[in-house]
Design a protein with these regions (language model features):
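Conserved class I S-adenosyl-L-methionine
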Residues: 1-45
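Class I SAM-dependent methyltransferase SAM/SAH-binding core
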Residues: 50-103
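A short acidic, Gly/Pro-enriched loop at the edge of an enzyme's catalytic core
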Residues: 105-112
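Residues lining the SAM
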Residues: 116-118
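A short glycine-rich, Lys/Arg-flanked "PGG" loop and its adjoining helix->strand segment in the class I
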Residues: 130-142
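SAM-dependent methyltransferase
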Residues: 148-232
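C-terminal lobe and adjacent flexible extensions of AdoMet/dcAdoMet transferase-like proteins
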Residues: 222-267
Length: 267
């Protein structure tokens, strides 16, 4: 069964089931430090981060609001249905909007715009990257901040991905990740095109259900592999200035060993 990963919220939930809030503490700390009243989350997906951030924000500020924007209708439908099961303060704080982060126009401004969980990597061309950054900056309130995190290129993985016959890796094996599912595995074959800095991951999702049924879903996912100097140039081109740079969610150095790029920028 093939298609887009973003058209199947169940797969997204299963692959993150072992630690669905792995990156949440960083975003909570950022909101605590900057004290925004209005937050815009781009590529918000199923609301994995949106809802807990709304809960934390409302504890601090009864007027706190967060807007989640995504272009996938299945993801938005899942998020809107899940929102109905959230506590009243979260329901009051959250609004979900459909839109493409390269070109949306909400006609409102935000104290903080965030792009979590490597989502900028799915914007592949320089033209689209600049459009996305410009659009995000245009939605910042005076004194607002723009923040994102990205996976740093793993050179051992890229070397394998350049091979004519790259290996398959099993990178997730989760037991009982959800009711009705006994086991979930994700295997991956990567191919890298250095001319475009595009890593194409062919993902094999195997779902073994409690009733004995099994199914395989195959998805191709293209990632743009960013490098720090490239990010600096893109940000400068749209008038965003990095205020904080680190190599991880806990302030790790941004060096050759960094596994992530975490930027907080002012506009």
């Amino acid at each position: 069964m093939t298609g887009s990963l973003w058209d199947n919220p169940e797969l997204y939930g299963l692959e993150n089931a072992d630690d669905p809030h792995f990156d949440l503490p960083f975003w909570q700390r950022l909101i605590e430090r900057r004290e925004p009243q209005r937050v815009l989350e781009l590529a918000s997906g199923t609301g994995r981060l949106t809802f807990p951030l709304a809960a934390a924000g409302r504890k601090r500020d009864a007027e706190f609001e967060i807007v989640g924007l995504d272009r996938s209708q299945p993801m938005l439908a899942h998020a809107r249905a899940a929102l109905l099961d959230q506590p009243a303060p979260v329901r009051a704080a959250v609004r979900m909007e459909e839109g493409d982060m390269r070109s949306f126009a909400l006609e409102e401004r935000f104290d903080l715009v965030i792009v979590p969980f490597n989502s900028l990597a799915y914007v592949h061309t320089r033209e689209d990257q600049l459009a996305c950054l410009r659009t995000a900056r245009a939605h910042l309130a005076p004194g607002g901040a723009f923040a994102f995190d990205l996976l740093a290129p793993r050179f051992d993985y890229l070397a394998e991905a350049l091979h004519p016959f790259p290996p398959m890796r099993v990178d997730a094996d989760i037991r009982t990740p959800a009711p009705g599912v006994e086991r979930f595995t994700r295997s991956c074959v990567d191919r890298y095109d250095p001319s475009t800095q595009t890593l194409t991951s062919t993902l094999y999702y195997d779902v073994h259900r409690s009733d004995g049924a099994s199914e395989r879903h195959v998805r191709d996912l293209d990632w743009h592999m960013y490098f720090p100097s490239e990010l600096e140039g893109l940000l400068a081109a749209v008038g965003l200035e990095p205020l904080e740079r680190s190599g991880g969610w806990n302030g790790e150095p941004l060096d050759a060993c960094a596994r992530r790029y975490v930027f907080v920028c002012g506009g």
